[in-house]
Amino acid sequence: MDTEADLFYRQLPKVELHAHLNGSVSFETMEKLIKRKPHLNIEHSMTAIRRGQRRTLDECFQVFKVIHQLVDSEEDILMVAKSVIQEFAADGVKYLELRSTPREVTETGLSKQRYIETVLEAIRQCKQEGVDIDVRFLVAVDRRHGPEVAMQTVKLAEDFLLSSDGTVVGLDLSGDPTVGHGKDLLAALQKAKNCGLKLALHLSEVPSQIDETELLLNLPPDRIGHGTFLHPDVGGSDSLVDKVCKQNIPIEICLTSNVKGQTVPSYDKHHFKYWYNRGHPCVLCTDDKGVFCTDLSQEYQLAASTFGLTKEAVWILSQQAIGYTFAPEPIKQRLEKTWAELKQQILQ
């Protein structure tokens, strides 16, 4: 990790709602994977964007390709998922929604079904081992793979929504935003919504996607990932902002990811400020803590130092995130109770 966050931000109970499994793999876990697969000739520099470095969004997607080569069997997925969950818990995250695109790898016999089952097994094992975190899973649709695969993924997600005892709660739409068009995936997303899956969609991650965003906001999604170019100052439109505000759709904010991936020029120019000042629901997230060398404590500290938030304001930001989770009501109530219990000792 680049810098240690202060104790207050570490102790702060947190909710993480935008975390891609493969992008969240830490330096230490990468080390183990690289050692296990020397024939791939992969170096650390290929899997993480170090401090002060910037990459284009395209280069960031190249990093994921490398990570996918390292994580290609059930054994890898189990190890990676468990370590990611443990690391979030160690950082004071009390509730986590992980997301990942189910993949099949013929060489290792991995199927999409087994991919999801293995992530669920990792979640189960962490719970059994007493790791202090509640974890749910969003099945991801990679937009690059087109409408047919999207429909198959939705079908899988639907099956797991019914069979995973509440662990699978929703669907994520992600992948390279410059590939494909949302209109081709609309039917699959609508089907997901109809069967009770919550939708977290990456929207307006790159400029000039007004038509697609307009279309997808009509669904509407339950949360927006990034939403970097929604407002008119950055090439979005008033009508997009109105839609988002009218429907009160929470925005998943990923500060470090956007700055290191160069979709935002600097922290102080981040769109968090625009939405936060409007009083719109925002939740701070890491996106890919491994790739971008960050953690959620750091993201909170960055937001506080960049935008002058008091500890009280930071606490409220963290607590409000409970309401934006896809967790069932009893879980939300339990989390509220946890926050209330911790407030006195942490917020002095």
From Swiss-Prot:
InterPro entries reported for this sequence: A_deaminase_dom (IPR001365), Ado/ade_deaminase (IPR006330), Metal_Hydrolase (IPR032466)
EC number: 3.5.4.-
Residues annotated as catalytic: E205 (proton donor)
SUPFAM superfamilies: Metallo-dependent hydrolases
Names of the cofactor(s): Zn(2+)
Binding residues annotated for Zn(2+), in chain numbering: H18, H20, H202, D287
Main EC class the enzyme belongs to: hydrolase
Chain positions of site Important for catalytic activity: H226
Cofactor note: Binds 1 zinc ion per subunit.
Gene Ontology BP, a term: nucleotide metabolic process
Binding site for N(6)-methyl-AMP: H20, N22, H68, S100, T101, P102, R103, D142, G175, E205, D287, D288
Described purpose of this protein according to its UniProt entry: Catalyzes the hydrolysis of the free cytosolic methylated adenosine nucleotide N(6)-methyl-AMP (N6-mAMP) to produce inositol monophosphate (IMP) and methylamine. Is required for the catabolism of cytosolic N6-mAMP, which is derived from the degradation of mRNA containing N6-methylated adenine (m6A).
Family, similarity comment: Belongs to the metallo-dependent hydrolases superfamily. Adenosine and AMP deaminases family.
Complexes and interactors: Monomer.
UniProt-recorded name of the protein: N6-Methyl-AMP deaminase
Biological source species: Danio rerio
Lineage, highest ranks first: Eukaryota, Metazoa, Chordata, Craniata, Vertebrata
